Amino acid sequence: MEHVMIRRLEHLTGSAAAPTLGFGVETRDRPGPLHKQGAFQDDVAWIQLHGGLFVARAAVRICWVGEYSDVASVRARTRGAPIHDLDEFWRGRPRYGYAGVATLARETWLDSPFWAGPRTYGYEWVVLESDAKRRSWLEPKDPPRGGTVLLDEFRVWRGGQA
């Protein structure tokens, strides 16, 4: 199975050589795609920046899904990864609800980032459970109006990482 993990540029972590996302996280006030369908060992997770630019891919090592009564309990599952310490990433999330936390491995930047996918409507995780959905999300397309700014910002961000 393949998945798309959507993250804002300011929540990206890693070096110029490789991403170090560590975890894919979905928290919602109602069950979302990751909570409903899960992710399993060796599933592919594509990393898309909010705005439509695909920049990396990883493999799922293990995934936890469940209900939570305090978002701090979800955050605790990411301890040791850079995302754990990004307060901005955790701010504004539902205080209680449904979550999925996928541990990522074999993270790599794409040699050529590409634009793809429909609007995300606030989702952080999408499961590509059919060929049609996979095509809809992964077939390259032209950047959106003003989208080249995101590509430039990503290149600057990645170039500035040690």
Regions found by a protein language model. Give the residues of each.
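Aromatic- and Lys/Arg-enriched surface recognition patch
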Residues: 54-55, 59-138
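Short, conserved beta-strand segments within well-ordered enzyme catalytic domains
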Residues: 46-48, 59
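Sparse, context-dependent recognition of short Cys/His-centered cofactor- or disulfide-binding micro-motifs
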Residues: 30, 45, 87-89
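Compositionally biased, charged N-terminal/linker segments
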Residues: 1-41, 48-51, 108-162
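Short beta-strand or tight-loop elements
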Residues: 41-43, 100
